[in-house]
Amino acid sequence: MKARAIVVTSGKGGVGKTTTTANLGAALAKLGEKVAVVDVDVGLRNLDVVMGLEGRVVFDLVDVLEGRARLRQALIRDKRVENLFLLPASQTKDKEALDPERFKEVVRALLEEEGFDRVLIDSPAGIEKGSQTAAAPAEGALVVVN
């Protein structure tokens, strides 16, 4: 069975997790998969910038988790790559805003209700709460090292 929810992680910052997430997401989408890339690096989000979508962020992951926005409202469709969508992290909230059980529900909804074939989760660096939350719904992991 292939992993449908994959966390892209590392023990330290600056190794290329975000770049790997964006590029793998684009490659899978170009192969015909419907892909959601989810930025869980609350407070230090960058996946939207790497993908060129920073000007289109209205709602984010924390808005969804805290009930201020529906999941579909927060998803941003990449106009350059068909079948590629971004769920951005919050730029202002603290990592404590992430609840692992609620995040599992968001990933489940992406796969089961929104029909995504694959969810790639861009994890914050380290082994603290943010990275643990990012890994909670994952069925597989891609560990980026340098």
Labelled PLM ranges:
Residues K2-D41:
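Walker A/P-loop phosphate-binding motif and the immediately C-terminal alpha-helix
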Residues S10, D39, P88-Q91, S123, ...:
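Flexible glycine-/small-residue-rich
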Residues T18, D99-P100, P124:
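A conditional alpha-helix N-cap/helix-loop micro-motif detector
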Residues K34-V35, V119, A141:
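Hydrophobic anchor at the start of a short beta-strand
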Residues V40-D117:
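P-loop/Walker-type NTP enzyme "switch/lid" segment
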Residues G115-G130:
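Glycine-rich phosphate-binding loop used to anchor ATP phosphates in small-molecule kinases
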Residues E128-N146:
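Inter-motif core of Ras-like GTPase G domains
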